């Protein structure tokens, strides 16, 4: 289970251990959703989610989110803490990069962006809304081989 007391290295190692288990389920889910999305030519919202619980007791959400012409594919799990919730995500289903969205970041995003502009996220949680609206991100490598991103 991902908890807020884990270090970034521990979170990354745990996520990569789960990835080998998730890979086949991700491929099957993508095939199903992509086929349905192409067949029905949706205009508007198309949301499909699947929750997979691994042997390590991590609940991963695989989400296919489409809004009008654009769509995004997310693989993420919550990082549970005492008060707030962060997320750990995988960047792709082939050669994943583990992305950590800290509880502090998610709390500030809710306070300073969603609440400030009175935005309704609809059926999306804050992480899904952020990922859907900020898909143009620049990943920058740090000297310790970790990344941070600029959106």
Description of each model-found segment:
Residues 1-151:
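Ribonuclease/tRNase effector modules and their secretory precursors
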